[in-house]
């Protein structure tokens, strides 16, 4: 089983239009796209919520977010699995987390590391391909 792991994906700032237009191919080199297509699963650490929430949570440091339409590009990653356990997922509070989960569920994207409640947040995720199985846990 081939797995790619990508960290700190933030579909905002200078690349916002490519993500919201679904043009992820403009952001990735040919060689990297080949590697993505060669993997059964591509695990992405989504380093921000996908939300329209405008009020950031009270915290020290920058608050990151991306538009829900960013999923147009992200869903083009084959075998996409999203990790949400990171220091920016709550930058726009609980609403930002819930909005992100809703977008992922609407697109049938498996995720881990956050949830609608504690039970869902603490669940593991089992990925299976043919005779191979791998368990993931992120908190």
Which residues does each predicted region cover?
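Acidic, metal/ion-coordinating pockets
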Residues: 1-139
């Amino acid at each position: 089983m081939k797995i790619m792991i990508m960290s700190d994906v933030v579909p905002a700032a200078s690349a916002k239009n490519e993500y919201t237009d679904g043009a992820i191919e403009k952001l990735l080199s040919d060689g990297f796209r080949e590697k993505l297509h060669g993997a059964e699963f591509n695990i992405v650490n989504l380093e921000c919520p996908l939300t329209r929430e405008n009020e950031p949570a009270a915290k020290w440091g920058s608050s990151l977010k991306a538009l829900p339409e960013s999923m147009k590009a992200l869903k083009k990653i084959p075998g996409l699995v999203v990790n949400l356990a990171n220091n920016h997922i709550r930058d726009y509070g609980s609403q930002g987390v819930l909005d992100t989960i809703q977008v992922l569920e609407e697109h049938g994207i498996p995720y881990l590391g956050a949830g609608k409640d504690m039970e869902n947040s603490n669940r593991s995720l089992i990925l299976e391909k043919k005779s191979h199985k791998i368990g993931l846990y992120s908190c």
